[in-house]
Amino acid sequence: MKHTFIIFNFILFSLVSADCPDLTTESECNEWPQYCEWNEDTNQCQNIGGGGDGGGNGDADGPYEYMTITESQGLRNGPDYRDGVVYYPINGETPYKSIVLTPGFGGGSSEMAAWAEFYASHGFIAMRIGPNDEINDSHYQRGLGLIDAIESIKQENSRTGSPLNGLVDMDSFSVSGYSMGGGASHDAAMIDGSLKAIISLNPTVIFEDCDYCPLEGGYCICLVPEFVDHSVPSLIFAGEVELNELTAYEGMLGQDIYSNMPESTDKIMFEGANSGHGFAAYPSGEVSNYALNWLKYHILDDVDACESLL
């Protein structure tokens, strides 16, 4: 399945809210009553409604309510990423398939909260992470972070006291990211070819290597086809006019990643007409529908989901 889609009439939006699981005290939680509530049973701040038909911030529109696991509650703190939070569905179909999410340049773990809530509300374990250095970590380092986070999810399957003990599908892990994180998802695929799927949200990719790339402006950066030569099924969201915003990334955006990946790899590029670099940053409309159906098809073997991708 190798198709290019141009989708019209996107509505761009921004998400402005507190990310409740990051608030560690009841008093902090109560400062955001429109979004958050304190759970007396878990001593944790959580999103109001916790998912299930539009709970949380309104992006988690799936049928399941969800909860979170933070590092203060025993989640492993991996060396290759920072600020991991796991979201998991309540009373979903087990064992749970997992997806790990990482942000773009300058962003932290909380930037991916809306996507994590969305996937958890649809029955997946979703872990959001941030890079150790939001400015200086390379695409490759962020890819290592995605793989390291998978190890943290795996350890929840055997950790005493974890609500996910015995509930994790140990053979089904996918990765996703926005912008620089979207490019890092392909680094992760090169590191671990057993990944089930990739969802790249307005990805960028840079390889700094003077053996492969021409020296321009004091730097040797480019897209090296050999470094996206993997077979992991990939859904790539790209804005038609992204290059107008990111002129320095000519040849290194989603369209370029798609065209340089092997023809044998199952891949789709979803190009937003007249859209820029941020149109897939948050789950909404056609973007979230395609992302969810990509996972349903490649992870849950849902043939009907395949029809929705054509």
Per-segment meaning from a language model:
Residues 110-129:
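Short amphipathic alpha-helix adjacent to the substrate-entry channel of hydrolases
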Residues 264-265, 273-310:
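Alpha/beta-hydrolase-fold serine-hydrolase catalytic core, especially in secreted/extracellular enzymes
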